[in-house]
């Protein structure tokens, strides 16, 4: 039996379960299973295309009395073709309808990159100049309305986060980014901590959709060594590293056994002598998002510009 999920406190005072469930490419049955196992933070996004399915699960489990809405922490994300201020509230309204809830606990700008309204997926001709300041003001209005209990960003570099902090009336509660032992984001961590922004790590075990990437994390020699010494799986060690580093983690799995395993990270810790070994792991970013950069059509001409060199 997994220990109760612990929390990180956001700058709004809200408590964010420190192990959440990533829902990209997840089916309803797996999400229902995860909630029944004990997951309470569900990380959604409109672009994932499954918010209606998730909404059906939420309605069923809340209606059956298995879980109360206030016990769940639901995150969703604004897609890049809805960045115009007039489109932001419409996008959240669609998400709320699909999820069959009255509010989200956290709403994020998914990428600091914009697409033309008629485009869903990023192609060179559909890339357009982002105006994050205007988009953020619309996000702040959603926060004021209570339909988004907290607002934040995703995939923002240190520079982009700093630029936003310089103009924001409401400080972002979260910056959700790729983070795992092979991409530790130390500089971004320090910035977020100094500004009261919680860092949340997606792909904490590497990307499930890219097997070779997952292996680079879970078969890393240092991660493997620590797991063997502690009698834990490499996945548990990677997740526990994240929690001890100070960020929430968003693993995803459709396997009941793995879902339980990923929650079993609370009643033990990585000793300091082993924890320091993680600083010796060579760093490599896996999610590069090359589709948001283009030398002719893109606002970001290169991925170095997209990530401001943090790549």
UniProtKB/Swiss-Prot annotation:
PANTHER family, A to Z: ALDO/KETO REDUCTASE (PTHR11732)
InterPro entries: AKR, AKR4C, Aldo/ket_reductase_CS, NADP_OxRdtase_dom, NADP_OxRdtase_dom_sf
Protein name: Aldo-keto reductase family 4 member C8
Organism the protein comes from: Arabidopsis thaliana
Induction profile: By drought, salt and cold stresses.
Residues the record lists as binding NADP(+): 23-24, 43, 110, 154-155, 176, 203-208, 252-254, 258-262
Entry coiled-coil feature ranges: none
GO cellular component: cytosol; endoplasmic reticulum
Molecular function GO labels: aldo-keto reductase (NADPH) activity; NADP+ binding; steroid dehydrogenase activity
Presence of keyword rRNA-binding: no
Signal peptide: none
Enzyme Commission number, as recorded: 1.1.1.-
Pfam families in alphabetical order: Aldo_ket_red
Active site as annotated: 48
Origin superkingdom: Eukaryota
UniProt keyword terms in alphabetical order: Acetylation, Detoxification, NADP, Oxidoreductase, Stress response
Modified residues (N-acetylalanine): 2
Family assignment from sequence similarity: Belongs to the aldo/keto reductase family.
Entry's Gene Ontology BP terms: response to cold; response to salt stress; response to toxic substance; response to water deprivation
Chain's role: Oxidoreductase acting on a broad range of substrates: reduces ketosteroids, aromatic aldehydes, ketones, sugars and other aliphatic aldehydes, and oxidizes hydroxysteroids. May function as detoxifiying enzyme by reducing a range of toxic aldehydes and ketones produced during stress.
CDD domains (alphabetical): AKR_AKR4C1-15
Annotated Gene3D superfamilies: NADP-dependent oxidoreductase domain
